[in-house]
């Protein structure tokens, strides 16, 4: 089917009546098709390992972000909430001498609130966290992108990144 798709995309790109933005989209799909076909012909080893009891809990953990030195992992954990049934908070785990992840610690206030924070992304040096927060009073939309700077061992008050990144819509999943 990849070859059939390639033929149709190539024919579309040659059409004089096709809109330029649609031609660009078709070219991107051609590139994706090339990657997919090559990836299937040349698989790479993939052996995921459980991160262990220091990170995993009875609820869900997701959106991990690791510092460039591979020594700290920041992630989102789904937790029970008094306001909502569930909400999300950030946790940090440190790599131990035996290469296991230490018991994750809640990042705490002012980053974590009784509202919803998710999809964190560390800066390379681990001194900034970019993340999504929803329903905050200063939000431009339902969810906005924020950042917090680390001062010693304490995370600073989250700052809304503002316009033009945040709009009246839903902004989420920042990647730094």
Show where each model-derived region lies:
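Short, conserved micro-motifs composed of acidic
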Residues: 2-4, 8-176
């Amino acid at each position: 089917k990849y070859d059939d798709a390639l033929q149709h995309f190539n024919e579309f790109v040659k059409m004089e009546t096709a809109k330029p933005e649609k031609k660009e989209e078709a070219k991107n799909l051609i590139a994706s098709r090339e990657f997919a076909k090559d990836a299937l012909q040349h698989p790479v080893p993939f052996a995921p390992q459980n991160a262990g009891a220091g990170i995993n809990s009875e609820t869900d953990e997701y959106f991990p972000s690791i510092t460039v030195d591979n020594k700290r992992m920041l992630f989102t954990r789904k937790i029970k909430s008094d306001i909502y049934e569930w909400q999300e908070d950030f946790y940090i785990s440190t790599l131990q001498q035996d290469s296991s992840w230490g018991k994750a610690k809640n990042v705490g206030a002012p980053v974590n609130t009784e509202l919803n924070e998710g999809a964190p992304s560390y800066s390379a040096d681990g001194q900034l966290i970019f993340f999504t927060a929803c329903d905050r009073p200063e939000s431009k939309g339902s969810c906005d992108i924020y950042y917090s700077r680390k001062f010693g061992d304490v995370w600073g008050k989250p700052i809304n990144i503002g316009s033009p990144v945040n709009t009246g819509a839903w902004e989420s999943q920042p990647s730094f």
